[in-house]
């Protein structure tokens, strides 16, 4: 028997649908993602912390869920909004249905939604604070009013430091390589790993670590608030700054650590939130975007070669190109809206990219950035 669910937005919009997953109430910033595949990777991406994700592709859950296609240990998104949940999940890798997976992780979802209407609203008005009520919480004459109250009570992501919330609690080593059919994820612990990389976990996606490990990196992952002196004492060949959720500006601990690294000649590579933090540490500024970039088909141009790459994106903040100091150079730009996508320091071996070269989900056109990072470490030796 189906259960009711309500999605309310801070502007007063109310949507009714069917509850999937857990019962109860959740709130967060409502965003939309245009990727056609990879819903499990999207849900488990820590960058979606405190966000309710609307998937624009109409059929979600067709292939179920498995234990391999995860980017973290649990679902990070605050909620899920979809058009249609198929009754049957069909895949030789399927271990669980999407609805059971959501319920097991105590995450709310709403199906049978007019996602096209919702997406157009978010596109035109910008990302909205919202709330989902599911199951018994969505019943009663005052349900809509309670949903609206919860939506308007959410403080929004501007000024919210979430990197230290989703980060690991203790340092750990990583030795899992890339996935292949029939073999799963490779164990690279016994292989040749000439480069020691210390990776800051601001909300790390696992596929980033896999792609670095596959390129000969011995990885030590450290919590977001690890002081620079502790990292430098590890004598790394390179320092990686991960993706993550929330506003980069409140992350003073990260910015000060990166500034210390930039006083050395150690190569630094940042992705997503790490890109924004590198920019802030170098003197640039960031801005909250209207509705952000969330999808797997975003064209980005390499400003040096002119080459266009299709990229995976997931961010609601961006570096303001007009604020770049003289020691920062723009190297990538979005062909959707012209926003800055990549920077490099002109005086230090440091660069970053706003999108996700590791994909998961999405294309790997930008994966050579990992090779560039490895080459920088090789050149420094």
UniProtKB/Swiss-Prot annotation:
InterPro entries linked to this entry: Anth_synth/Amidotransfase, CarbamoylP_synth_ssu, CarbamoylP_synth_ssu_N, CarbP_synth_ssu_N_sf, Class_I_gatase-like, CPSase_GATase1, GATASE
Pathway as given in its UniProt record: Amino-acid biosynthesis; L-arginine biosynthesis; carbamoyl phosphate from bicarbonate: step 1/1; Pyrimidine metabolism; UMP biosynthesis via de novo pathway; (S)-dihydroorotate from bicarbonate: step 1/3
Keywords noted in UniProt: Amino-acid biosynthesis, Arginine biosynthesis, ATP-binding, Glutamine amidotransferase, Ligase, Nucleotide-binding, Pyrimidine biosynthesis
One MF term in the entry's GO annotations: ATP binding
GO terms (BP aspect): 'de novo' pyrimidine nucleobase biosynthetic process; 'de novo' UMP biosynthetic process; glutamine metabolic process; L-arginine biosynthetic process
Domain Glutamine amidotransferase type-1 stretches: 196-381
Sites where the protein binds L-glutamine: 47, 244, 246, 273, 276, 314, 316-317
Pfam families given in the database record: CPSase_sm_chain (PF00988), GATase (PF00117)
Active site: 272 (nucleophile), 356, 358
Coiled coil ranges: none
Catalytic activity: hydrogencarbonate + L-glutamine + 2 ATP + H2O = carbamoyl phosphate + L-glutamate + 2 ADP + phosphate + 2 H(+)
EC number of this enzyme: 6.3.5.5
Region feature (CPSase): 1-192
The keyword Amino-acid biosynthesis appears for this protein: yes
Protein role: Small subunit of the glutamine-dependent carbamoyl phosphate synthetase (CPSase). CPSase catalyzes the formation of carbamoyl phosphate from the ammonia moiety of glutamine, carbonate, and phosphate donated by ATP, constituting the first step of 2 biosynthetic pathways, one leading to arginine and/or urea and the other to pyrimidine nucleotides. The small subunit (glutamine amidotransferase) binds and cleaves glutamine to supply the large subunit with the substrate ammonia.
Summary of subunit composition and partner proteins: Composed of two chains; the small (or glutamine) chain promotes the hydrolysis of glutamine to ammonia, which is used by the large (or ammonia) chain to synthesize carbamoyl phosphate. Tetramer of heterodimers (alpha,beta)4.
Family from the record: Belongs to the CarA family.
Protein name: Carbamoyl phosphate synthase small chain
Organism (species): Halomonas eurihalina
């Amino acid at each position: 028997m189906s259960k009711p669910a309500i999605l309310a937005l801070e502007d007063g919009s109310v949507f009714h649908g069917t509850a999937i997953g857990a019962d109860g109430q959740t709130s967060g910033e409502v965003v939309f993602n245009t990727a056609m595949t990879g819903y499990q990777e999207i849900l488990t991406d820590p960058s979606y912390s405190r966000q309710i994700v609307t998937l624009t592709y109409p059929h979600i859950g067709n292939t179920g869920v498995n234990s391999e296609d995860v980017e973290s240990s649990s679902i990070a998104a605050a909620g899920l909004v979809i058009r249609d949940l198929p009754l049957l999940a069909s895949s030789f890798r399927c271990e669980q249905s999407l609805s059971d997976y959501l319920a097991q992780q105590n995450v709310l979802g709403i199906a049978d939604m007019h996602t096209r209407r919702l997406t157009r609203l978010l596109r035109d008005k910008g990302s909205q604070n919202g709330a989902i009520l599911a199951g018994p919480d969505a019943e009663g004459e005052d349900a809509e009013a309670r949903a609206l109250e919860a939506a308007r009570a959410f403080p929004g992501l501007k000024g919210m430091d979430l990197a230290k919330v989703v980060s690991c609690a203790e340092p750990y080593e990583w030795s899992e390589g890339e996935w292949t059919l029939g073999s799963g994820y490779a164990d690279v612990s016994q292989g040749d790993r000439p480069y020691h990389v210390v990776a800051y976990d601001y909300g790390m996606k696992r596929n980033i670590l896999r792609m670095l490990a596959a390129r000969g990196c011995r990885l030590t992952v450290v919590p977001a608030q690890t002081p620079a002196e502790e990292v430098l004492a590890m004598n790394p060949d390179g320092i990686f700054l991960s993706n993550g959720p929330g506003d980069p500006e409140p992350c003073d601990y990260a910015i000060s650590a990166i500034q210390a690294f930039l006083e050395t000649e150690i190569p630094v590579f940042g992705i997503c939130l790490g890109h924004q933090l590198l920019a802030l540490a170098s003197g640039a500024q960031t801005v909250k975007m209207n509705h952000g970039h969330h999808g797997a088909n975003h064209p980005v141009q390499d400003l040096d070669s002119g080459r266009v790459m299709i990229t995976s994106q997931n961010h609601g903040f961006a570096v303001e190109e007009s604020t770049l100091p003289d020691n920062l150079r723009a190297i990538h730009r979005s062909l959707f809206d012209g926003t800055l996508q990549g920077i490099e320091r002109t005086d230090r071996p440091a660069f970053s990219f706003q999108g996700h070269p590791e994909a998961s989900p999405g294309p790997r056109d930008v994966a050579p950035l990992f090779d560039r990072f490895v080459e920088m470490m090789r050149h420094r030796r």
